[in-house]
């Protein structure tokens, strides 16, 4: 009965949304496009989510934490897919495929493979014990307050990093489509997050996530079909876009061999060589460059120079590295960026393109390391694993994972198609155009977000060359309809889908953090006699506080969305995967072993990120060497083995678990 009612309700909702899109399209054709379309596509869905959240409000403890454990498997799979398909997937993944080609398939393969691990290794056993949170599961398995506290801290850390990435995505969407400042867009998005989760907890989040999945999947399938038909690929290009790949490969070869392109790349190499000279002359070059800026600013002020130039020099001086050590980090990054732009275009179809085996091997290692981290991180994310506690039974949890994979596959089969089509549009319609006739979308995006796209005439010939286009991956999806020449209503649809992806994941993460604080720390460690009503109230207050703090951190714009997501996966894998797997499948795992494994994995992962990621190196002035050339986004490849090794060794050296613990593991292992 419940399933039939849900199918009827969400079918009507889907038809209503598609009719809403068609209506706006007709209005645009009749009255013309404008920023009002962006407002409508952002605020009308938020209003719908608010209504669902209001109707799902509850103060019942089981409803608030796990939606009453009565969510049908198909709908839980849809909600989990929405929880999973974050701003990084929607905004960043197609951009990474566009920029790096084959290398970005690590995200698709890693994330999809992770759900196989969820199905076979964890979801049924987590559901069998039927706890409210993952720290609750581990605290019960090891009968330890220390394990619970440590797991709660790790869940808060990895979820918070992931949450910041989602809120940054919301800020980017609001900035582009309603024209507000990035920070204001973030706090507008905060309201959207809270209306979905504040009143109803997991119950409200579940039903809003189902609604959000319908919007986000429509927002990827419809534009892909429209752009494909424009390129002669038909309305379902997911299984037949090889012809377009051949056209892209041919144009990439032309760009690679073009003399003008080589002149542009030579210009970047000369700029990189100049920066290398400055690096070689440190610290003298630091004092010289800083002195030059100070002298220029003083001269402009003395001669009443233009306010714009004075402001530019003041900003440059404020952003100048604080000491020679920080200058080395910043200038090294600038040199590397120039050298990357000086490289020939990366062929989309070719695995690990490189001039030699010495260049290819690090790329292969990083591909495998990232794939591994994403797979293990997927199987360890608390906000994903907790979703399977909302199903009606262990068997339903297994079926729910299958539905999750199906709904995610609908999205992931479309993303590579979009990346290929947008790359073809850029190569065919932007490269080779005169600078005097740049498309409107280039100037508009550069006006709103100059860091996302820039086209500079490096060799002064008045023609746009591939190497002169600097386009951040995060803008590829949001700008796709404009790049392909589609109506602005399709851009609004993309914005609604991106917002749905960011909100759905942000809601799940926010609830995970608030529940870890209220249930695992407040209830189990501070006030075990607290009433159910008080526990729900505390969770709501904490949810509001965490949302405000995460929005503030996101407004600082601390890193690329895709990097923040990758870091969250590495943190989750390093802290949770060893102890979850050992806790379920090895009775010999002890409390001390679990604590040692979690601490070791987390410390190794955090150290590697902080010591090798340029943003942190700039903050601290310390830049450590990479291990085996592995990038910081894949730090979990070191944290997970360290966590397993330490947990196993300490458990073997410790006393065996008692009879109760062994019986509990047997109970968990027979779902």
What residue ranges belong to the model's regions?
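Membrane-embedded helix-loop-helix hairpins and adjacent transmembrane boundary segments
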Residues: 1-671
């Amino acid at each position: 009965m419940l399933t039939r009612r849900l199918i009827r309700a969400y079918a009507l909702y889907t038809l209503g949304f598609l009719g809403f899109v068609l209506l706006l399209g007709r209005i645009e054709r009749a009255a013309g496009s404008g920023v009002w379309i962006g407002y409508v596509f952002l605020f009308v869905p938020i209003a719908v989510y608010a209504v669902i959240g209001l109707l799902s409000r509850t103060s019942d403890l089981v409803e608030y934490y796990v939606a009453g454990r009565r969510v049908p498997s198909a709908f839980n799979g849809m909600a989990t897919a929405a929880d999973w398909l974050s701003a990084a997937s929607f905004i960043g993944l197609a951009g990474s495929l566009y920029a790096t080609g084959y290398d970005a398939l690590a995200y698709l393969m890693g994330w999809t493979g992770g759900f196989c691990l969820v199905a076979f290794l964890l979801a049924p056993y987590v559901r069998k014990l039927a706890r409210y949170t993952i720290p609750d599961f581990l605290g019960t398995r090891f009968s330890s307050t220390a394990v619970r506290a440590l797991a709660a801290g790790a869940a808060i850390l990895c979820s918070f990093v992931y949450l910041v990435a989602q809120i940054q995505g919301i800020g980017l969407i609001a900035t582009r489509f309603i024209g507000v400042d990035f920070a204001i867009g973030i706090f507008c998005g905060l309201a959207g997050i809270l209306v979905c989760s504040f009143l109803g907890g997991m119950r409200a989040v579940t039903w809003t996530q189902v609604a959000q999945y319908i919007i986000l999947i429509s927002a990827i399938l419809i534009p892909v079909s429209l752009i494909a038909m424009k390129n002669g690929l038909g309305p379902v290009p997911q299984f037949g876009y090889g012809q377009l790949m051949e056209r892209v490969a041919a144009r990439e070869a032309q760009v690679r061999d073009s003399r003008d392109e080589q002149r542009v790349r030579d210009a970047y190499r000369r700029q990189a060589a100049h920066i290398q000279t400055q690096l070689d002359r440190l610290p003298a070059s630091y004092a010289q460059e800083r002195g030059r800026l100070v002298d220029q600013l003083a001269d402009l002020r003395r001669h009443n120079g233009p306010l714009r130039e004075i402001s530019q020099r003041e900003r440059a001086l404020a952003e100048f590295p604080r000491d020679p050590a920080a200058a080395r980090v910043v200038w090294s990054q600038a040199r590397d960026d120039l050298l990357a732009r000086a490289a020939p275009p990366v062929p989309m179809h070719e695995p690990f393109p490189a001039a030699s085996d010495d260049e290819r091997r690090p790329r292969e290692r990083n591909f495998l390391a990232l794939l591994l981290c994403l797979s293990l991180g997927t199987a360890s994310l608390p906000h994903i694993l907790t979703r399977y506690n909302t199903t009606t039974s262990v068997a339903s949890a297994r079926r729910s994972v299958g539905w999750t994979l199906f709904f995610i596959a609908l999205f992931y089969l479309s993303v590579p198609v979009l990346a290929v089509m947008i790359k073809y549009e850029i190569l065919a319609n932007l490269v080779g155009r005169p600078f005097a006739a740049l498309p409107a979308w280039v100037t508009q995006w550069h006006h709103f977000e100059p860091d996302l796209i820039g086209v500079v005439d490096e060799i002064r010939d008045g023609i746009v060359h591939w190497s002169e286009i600097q386009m951040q991956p995060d803008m590829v999806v949001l700008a796709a309809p404009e790049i392909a020449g589609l109506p602005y209503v399709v851009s609004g649809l993309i914005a609604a889908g991106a917002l749905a992806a960011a909100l759905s994941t942000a809601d799940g993460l926010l609830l995970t953090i608030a529940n870890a604080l209220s249930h695992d720390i407040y209830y189990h460690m501070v006030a075990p006699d607290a009433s159910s009503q008080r526990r729900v109230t505390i969770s709501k207050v904490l949810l509001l506080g965490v949302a405000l703090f995460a929005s503030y951190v996101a407004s600082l714009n601390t890193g690329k969305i895709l990097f923040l997501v990758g870091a969250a996966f590495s943190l989750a894998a390093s802290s949770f995967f060893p102890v979850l797997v050992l806790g379920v499948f090895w009775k010999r795992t002890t409390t001390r072993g679990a604590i040692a494994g979690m601490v070791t994995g987390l410390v190794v992962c955090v150290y590697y990120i902080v010591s090798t990621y340029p943003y942190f190196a700039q903050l601290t002035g310390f830049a450590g060497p990479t291990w085996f050339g592995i990038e910081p986004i894949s730090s979990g490849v070191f944290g997970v083995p360290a966590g397993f090794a330490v947990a196993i060794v300490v458990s073997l050296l410790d006393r065996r678990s008692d009879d109760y613990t062994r019986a509990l593991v047997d109970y968990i292992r027979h779902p």
